[in-house]
């Protein structure tokens, strides 16, 4: 299963760990979207930045 992740808030003033989590998800700019495989590594990073992103499941 895949998920679509969209960065909805900017990175200014955010913790370094949150910035690293977003970089590992491939998100750098606001409103950027990525389609990722649903696996434990991705879900762990999403948990760290759940307040900055919007997540949807895709088929």
UniProtKB/Swiss-Prot annotation:
<dbReference type="InterPro" id="IPR036919">
    <property type="entry name" value="Ribo_uL30_ferredoxin-like_sf"/>
</dbReference>
<dbReference type="InterPro" id="IPR005996">
    <property type="entry name" value="Ribosomal_uL30_bac-type"/>
</dbReference>
<comment type="subunit">
    <text>Part of the 50S ribosomal subunit.</text>
</comment>
<dbReference type="GO" id="GO:0006412">
    <property type="term" value="P:translation"/>
</dbReference>
<dbReference type="InterPro" id="IPR016082">
    <property type="entry name" value="Ribosomal_uL30_ferredoxin-like"/>
</dbReference>
<dbReference type="Pfam" id="PF00327">
    <property type="entry name" value="Ribosomal_L30"/>
</dbReference>
<dbReference type="GO" id="GO:0022625">
    <property type="term" value="C:cytosolic large ribosomal subunit"/>
</dbReference>
<protein>
    <recommendedName>
        <fullName>Large ribosomal subunit protein uL30</fullName>
    </recommendedName>
</protein>
<comment type="similarity">
    <text>Belongs to the universal ribosomal protein uL30 family.</text>
</comment>
<keyword id="KW-0689">Ribosomal protein</keyword>
<keyword id="KW-0687">Ribonucleoprotein</keyword>
<dbReference type="GO" id="GO:0003735">
    <property type="term" value="F:structural constituent of ribosome"/>
</dbReference>
């Amino acid at each position: 299963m895949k998920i679509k992740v969209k960065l909805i808030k900017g990175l200014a003033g955010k913790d370094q760990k949150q910035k690293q989590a977003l970089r590992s998800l491939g998100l750098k700019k606001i409103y950027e979207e990525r389609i990722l495989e649903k696996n434990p590594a991705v879900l762990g990073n999403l948990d760290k930045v759940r307040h900055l992103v919007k997540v949807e499941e895709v088929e």
